[in-house]
Amino acid sequence: RHDIAAVRVVPRPGDAPMTLDTVHVDLYFFLDVDLVLLNVEVTANHLPLETAQELMYRFGRAYPAGWDPRGQALHCLAQAEWLDAQGQVLAASDANQRDAFLAQVSSRRAPRISAHWDFLMRPLVGDHSDHPGLLRFRQIEYYRMPQMAYLAMDRPRDLTRSDFVRLGLVTGSGARDPAGGCALPYGEQHLAEFESKYCYDRFWTEGGAAPNTRYLCNGHAMVVVGDASSQFYACRDRGVLAQFRHQHFLVFLIAHFQKAALLMYSDRLAETLKNLDISDPASVRHFKRAIRSGFASFLRFTHRYWFHEVAEQAQSRALFRMCSEHLGLDALHGEVKTRVS
């Protein structure tokens, strides 16, 4: 889409509005698999670390997780507005309209997508919504959208362990003590293996073209933190920024496509079983045809899209492995394969 130039957001109630520039909004389709992945890239400069953490935590949520006693939506942006090139509002979030969300869950047994994301998906419309449209979609993955974040810091070595944990696990900001420190979001025992599980520290060193560069990956999110003063780190043509936007983006996209496809095949099988009436010969015949079709489709997916290595480069290979392991792709593939066959 080319009509969206920016997004104006209020991270938490009482925060000042801020405007993020929109780099691009794309919808990715895949051959022979009925999946689409939405890709939205936004950018901003000179943000405090706490603001960046809150934006990462709140931005990509398809709908609110709940509401507080005052009716304020929880864990998502307090307000979001898509803007055109003239600054006019194209669509705004409706997260605080609690009754509308609960009404759809009550009547359709399916969540309601927030208005600003619903607008972004047009001309596709939600399958459970009342909007007319031939092209319809259903949410198949978690309501917290997968995200990537590129952070150029003034002094990345000054970040505390708590800062990295909050960035890597996307937990939002925490209260600062008088010395400027911040408590860990989870217990120390739970985070004992954080560095070995979630950090890729090959370039976390004072030397090299992009010194003090650390990658963090938990499957749901991939984050890179580096030195803003490094020319190579900030280079959008050949440096870390270019690699992150193109090469590492594809690594992350492939991993989440594989997960979404496996979830889709599992969902289709469940729908097929739900519609089976063993006392009706026509229903049994339809069931057999659907099972054969599903098996053939899964076989094509396995041969065309299922692989464990996506690059020869050691860094990309390692990042893809981290994504796959945290998403549990091998176990999910084995489970779906057993059910389909």
Enumerate the language-model features and the residues they cover.
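Long, charged/polar, low-complexity intrinsically disordered N-terminal extensions
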Residues: 1-4
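Membrane-associated alpha-helical segments
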Residues: 244-341
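Short beta-strand segments that buttress and anchor functional surface loops
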Residues: 6-12
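Extended alpha-helical interaction modules
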Residues: 12-277
